[in-house]
Every structure is written in structure tokens, then in C-alpha cells.
Regions:
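Acidic/glycine-enriched connector segments
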Residues: 3-179
Length: 180
């Protein structure tokens, strides 16, 4: 089973430093979700390599692999130079994730050229996975909205599992006794 992971960029959820407590909480929450998916038979986790939820998930997947879970990480980057605007720390994290991934490639083997690419990228990701774990609130104005809407459209005509995580669920996780 191949699971696509998508979600917020750090700035979309008020995260501006990697050592903020919110990052620790999100990673613990993501780890719990990953373990649920592994228990249900997930073998591959797919990300595009965007900062925030995707790279947090990648870090947790790598930790789980180091703990001998039999899972794989695929990084399907959207196009060449998609990470040009990443700061030095994010560039280093992406390079570490790519080095530890089991598969990495570009969906488009060229730099960005037109907005239509994103629609094709989303379609490619969805049609090559069995389900998605998406961190997204309807009220939030986030880039992941486009992926989420594409998944909804696809799942209307095809068997595709989608789990959408909203802020309420993360807050419940914190309230239930998450303690770092």
C-alpha cells in the first residue's frame, strides 16, 4: 500500500523555527499516524519534498526505518529547482531526506514553466498511490488545498482512501496527554 502525504508549509501554520514546540508536537502526531498506517499494511510513503508536514513526515519515516520497520520512503519532487527558495537549513534537510530515501525522482525533469504542471503533478501522485494522509483545514488558505481537491475529484470515480487531519484532531492529541 502506497500512501501520499501532504500538508501545510511551516509559515502557513505559524512555524518559523525548526525548534518550536509545535514542530515536536506535529512530529509526534505524524509518527502515531504513520504507525497506524504501517499496522494497516502501508509499505511506501510518498512525499514531494516540500517544507513543513512533508519533511516532518520524512524525518519520522526515516526514524521508523532506523527502528527496523519495513517501510520505504519515496520523494517525487514536482520539477527541477522547486526548492530554489528554500533557506540553507531547509535545503540541508531536503538533501538529508533525499539521501535516506528509497526512491527519488522528479515528476517533471525540467524547471517550472506553467501553472498547468501542478494539475498534472497532482494527478500523477494520486494515480500512483493508494491513499493519502492530508493535513488540511477547509478554513485555511493553504497550497495543499489544490492537492486535496484533486484527491476528492479522483476519489469520486476511483477507489482511493483519504484521511484528512484538521487542527481539532491535533489539538485533541495534545490534550490527550502528549508530553515531550
Amino acid at each position: 500500500v502506497r500512501i501520499l502525504i501532504g500538508g501545510y508549509r511551516p509559515y502557513e501554520i505559524g512555524i518559523f523555527k525548526p525548534d518550536q514546540k509545535e514542530v515536536t508536537v506535529l512530529k509526534a502526531f505524524i509518527r502515531n499516524k504513520l504507525l497506524e498506517y504501517i499496522d494497516e499494511g502501508a509499505e511506501w510513503f510518498i512525499i514531494q519534498g516540500y517544507t513543513g508536514i512533508e519533511l516532518y513526515a520524512a524525518e519520522e519515516i526515516i526514524r521508523l526505518k532506523e527502528a527496523h520497520y519495513d517501510i520505504s520512503l519515496g520523494v517525487l519532487m514536482p520539477f527541477h529547482q522547486f526548492d530554489d527558495r528554500y533557506n540553507e537549513m531547509d535545503q540541508a534537510l531536503l538533501q538529508k531526506v533525499l539521501a535516506e530515501s528509497d526512491f527519488k525522482d522528479y515528476i517533471y525533469k525540467q524547471p517550472y514553466s506553467n501553472p498547468g504542471m501542478f494539475k498534472h503533478i497532482n494527478r500523477f501522485l494520486i494515480s500512483n498511490t493508494d491513499g493519502a494522509l492530508i493535513f488540511f483545514d477547509e478554513e485555511a488558505d493553504a497550497k495543499v488545498r489544490f492537492l486535496y481537491n484533486a484527491i476528492l475529484e479522483f476519489s469520486g470515480e476511483n477507489p482511493y482512501n483519504i484521511e484528512r487531519i484538521q487542527f481539532d484532531e491535533i489539538n485533541s492529541f495534545i490534550d490527550s496527554g502528549f508530553d515531550n
